[in-house]
Regions:
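Catalytic pocket of metal/acid-base enzymes, prominently hydrolases
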Residues: 2-33, 44, 126-131, 136-149, ...
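Gly-rich Lys/Arg/Thr-decorated short loops/hinges at beta-loop-alpha junctions or inter-strand turns
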Residues: 6-17, 36-38, 231-240
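Histidine/acidic residue-rich metal-binding segments in metalloenzymes
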Residues: 11-100, 106-123
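Active-site-proximal loop/turn and secondary-structure-junction residues that shape catalytic pockets
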Residues: 47-51, 71-73, 102-103, 210, ...
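Hydrophobic/aromatic-rich, well-ordered segments within soluble, folded domains that form packed cores
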Residues: 64, 68-70, 293-307, 333, ...
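Short linear, low-complexity motifs centered on an aromatic residue
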Residues: 76-92, 109-112, 215, 222-224, ...
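Glycine-rich, acidic/polar active-site loops that bind/position phosphate-bearing ligands
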Residues: 126-314, 323-326, 333-570
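C-terminal amphipathic alpha-helical interaction region
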Residues: 502, 507-703
Length: 703
């Protein structure tokens, strides 16, 4: 039996926690740092120098030689540049290890080398990173050694946000300010801050390293671009929550240990629906820390996989025909004195503050469904949304029977006199306990579902940063809170006004509530009748962030400027085009150099066999039939390959980012599908010893 792991002892050992700060800083300095962490403001440079020295000393004691400003540019992944603590030797030639407050607070990476949507050019490259004091520094050990990572925001020389974190932090402040107005109106005078808490459920696939290395599509695109279905997929429903394989379990064990050391509260692990698909879920944290930690989770998943001769696939759709991966974004809002604004209590019909919060959220989601849809858009997610494995591309809200009934009563009569209860679940077995049921069931097809004391936004893609969805959620809810607070603060009769607002908002926005089957065709038709947007792709959603309505929202709360939004729209088009271009070129490479030559060779063998058999006096009917089938599909594949080459060349020559992106969507992707179809059919009829790449059966079942 392996040595017992003391989780309490190792948890956070690679993190410069508040506890470690308290041990290493004077009381005066510590209190100043804690004040800025909790309430904002600036540290004096003297204090910053003291904190920097303490942080450096701790890092060096743990083997660190370098530090980095760890930030999240608009690539959606993290970025870092390593600087050593080494400084100029003293007069005696002794090397000093130094780290100043200025180096802690500010860095200067090249802003022109990251996506900026035209905000930064090569001749105006300066950008700044700024220390996010609310997210703790941590140590990462890799081939580079031990690096002190300092979470930072990233902006241009002219002040525009060039990252995912800066708008998130702005949105958190906006939400806190507006939510505080609401809770104070209801008598919570002790609250000084309201925090959005987030818990993302991270799905992923594992694949054997050697098989991965034989698939150019997995290496370059992160997903398979060719592949016939395996004889067995997920139809037996035996993988979800099934027994975890030894190799996968060993990987999960090491992953948990790595994450616990980094202060990530990894809580749940299990097999997901598709073969070789799994999930890890943490405990809730403050939104910006949850965003940082989710990036660490994804990086650790890849890093630990290497140690086990595996590769971790975070793409939303690595394999056709089986479920892809998402990232359920659980979101709640809580005051700093412990009040969860999304807790309905035992009698939600009488919980007026909760009903107002719920009404505001319904208003926010209905009014800005397009923005919420856009916040979960990426190229990979286009393969999932609306495909009977993930929420539809139509935004709706699931409340469950209890709350939907409360809303119905309020809309129809202005009052909710009664509330449905869950009752008892009786198992009928004397040795099993009976227990209280929840008041409502779960709906796995809903994109935005209330689940007891939080909302679960289920559209987010597995490879995507959760910063944008939470920025959008915070912003749209802050706006609804602001409008309600404006009215309530001026109201002559508070009780009457709050009831009027609740009924008005619920009546106006009840169309967004849907408790039924989001996968059904009937819902698509019903959503259209209700006037709900059905935005089917990433690039169709892109323009939603630059509408006058969106710009007014984000500018009102200082989250984005119009220029920042326009740059992000441009980046969306560029990202889409570049991604599809990589996929198209990979298909051209695989089909032209590997698959078609192998099939042509096999067709030659069949032709020789037909000739030999006929010369021997036999009919060769089966061989002839096989040859004709292979030859026909081969010709179809070669023609499709030529077409893909032509349209890819045309796409690459298009100048405008938006025009180019739509050409890739409407023309190049169609040509890619046309090439895949005959090649997947060929895989089913060509000798397996000749087929040049691992099959779905190999990839999903040899882990």
């Amino acid at each position: 039996m392996s040595e017992a792991l003391n989780v309490e002892k190792i948890f956070g050992e690679k993190v410069f926690t508040v506890e470690k700060m308290k041990e290493r800083l004077t009381r005066k300095v510590f209190l100043e740092v804690k004040r800025v962490m909790d309430y904002g403001g600036e540290l004096s440079m003297t204090t910053a120098d003291v904190v920097a020295k303490a942080m450096k000393d701790w890092a060096v004691e743990n083997g660190a030689t370098h530090y980095t400003h760890w930030f999240q540019p608009l690539t959606g992944i993290t970025a870092e540049k390593h600087d050593s603590f080494v400084s100029h030797p003293d007069a005696e030639g002794k090397m000093l290890m130094e780290f100043s407050g200025k180096e802690l607070i500010k860095g200067e990476p090249d802003a022109s080398s990251f996506p900026s949507g035209g905000l930064r050019a090569t001749f105006e490259a300066r950008g700044y990173t700024a220390w996010d004091i609310t997210s703790p520094a941590f140590l990462i050990e890799s081939g580079c050694g031990v690096i002190l990572c300092i979470p930072t925001a990233f902006c241009s020389y002219t002040g525009e946000a060039l990252d995912k974190k800066t708008p998130l932090l702005r949105s958190m402040e906006a939400l806190s300010e507006q939510a505080l107005r609401i809770v104070k109106l209801f008598g919570n005078k002790g609250a000084t801050k309201v925090t959005a808490s987030v818990g993302p459920e991270q799905e992923y696939f594992l694949v054997d390293k050697d098989l991965y290395m034989q698939r150019k599509d997995l290496m370059f695109a992160g997903r398979t671009l060719f592949g016939a279905p395996a004889p067995k997929g997920q139809e037996m429903e035996d993988h979800y929550f099934g027994v975890i394989k030894e190799r996968v379990g060993a990987y999960m064990k090491d992953l948990n240990e790595e994450l616990w050391k980094l202060g990530v509260t990894a809580k749940t692990q299990h097999n997901e629906v598709a073969p070789a698909q799994h999930e890890l879920a943490p405990i809730y944290e403050t939104a910006n820390i949850a965003v940082d930690h989710n990036q660490l989770v994804m990086e650790a998943m890849k890093r630990v996989a290497y140690k086990h001769d595996l590769r971790c696939l975070l793409h939303e759709k690595p394999y056709a025909g089986v479920n892809g991966s998402g990232k359920h974004n659980n979101w709640s809002i809580t005051t700093d004195n412990g009040e969860n604004l999304l807790d309905p209590g035992d009698t939600p019909n009488k919980n007026i503050q909760f009903l107002l919060v719920l009404a505001c959220i319904l208003r926010a989601v209905d009014r800005h469904a397009d923005l919420l849809r856009q916040s979960a858009s990426d190229v990979g997610n286009d393969h999932r949304l609306g495909a009977n494995e993930a929420p539809p591309a139509i935004i709706s809200v699931f409340l469950g029977d209890q709350l939907e009934d409360v809303v119905r009563q309020l809309v129809e009569t202005g009052d909710a006199a009664k509330v449905k209860q869950g009752g008892k679940l009786e198992t009928g077995v004397s040795t099993l306990p009976d227990f209280e049921k929840d008041a409502t069931d779960r709906n796995r097809t809903s994109p935005f579902a209330f689940t007891g004391n939080k909302f679960e936004f289920r559209m987010v893609g597995s490879a995507d940063s959760i910063a944008s969805p939470n920025t959008t959620l915070n912003a749209i809810v802050a706006e609804a809170f602001c409008e309600a607070a404006d009215r309530l603060e001026k109201a002559a009769d508070f009780d009457l006004e709050v009831h009027d607002i609740i009924k008005e908002y619920m009546t106006a926005h009840q169309r967004i509530i849907f408790n039924g089957d989001g996968y059904s065709d009937e819902w698509v038709a019903e959503a259209e009748r209700r006037g709900l947007p059905n935005i089917k792709s990433m690039i169709e959603a892109a323009s939603t962030i630059t509408t006058d309505k969106a710009v007014a929202l984000f500018e009102k709360f200082g989250i984005f400027t119009r220029v920042e939004l326009e740059s992000r729209e441009e980046i969306i088009y560029e990202t889409y085009a570049k991604t599809i271009n990589i996929e198209a070129l990979t298909m051209i490479d695989m089909a032209g150099k590997d698959i078609i030559p192998a099939v042509a060779s096999y067709a030659g063998e069949l032709a020789n066999a037909v000739i030999a058999i006929k010369e021997a006096g036999a009919g060769a009917a089966a061989q002839t039939e096989m040859l004709l089938e292979v030859d026909g599909l081969l010709a179809e594949a070669k023609k499709a390959l030529n077409t893909l080459k032509e349209v890819e060349a045309k796409a690459s020559a298009i100048a405008g980012a938006k025009e180019q992106a739509f050409y890739y969507k409407d023309v190049v992707k169609v040509a890619m599908d046309a090439l895949r179809a005959p090649i997947d059919k060929l895989e089913m009829v060509v000798d397996s010893t000749i087929w040049p790449i691992p099959t779905y059966g190999d990839l999903m079942f040899e882990v």
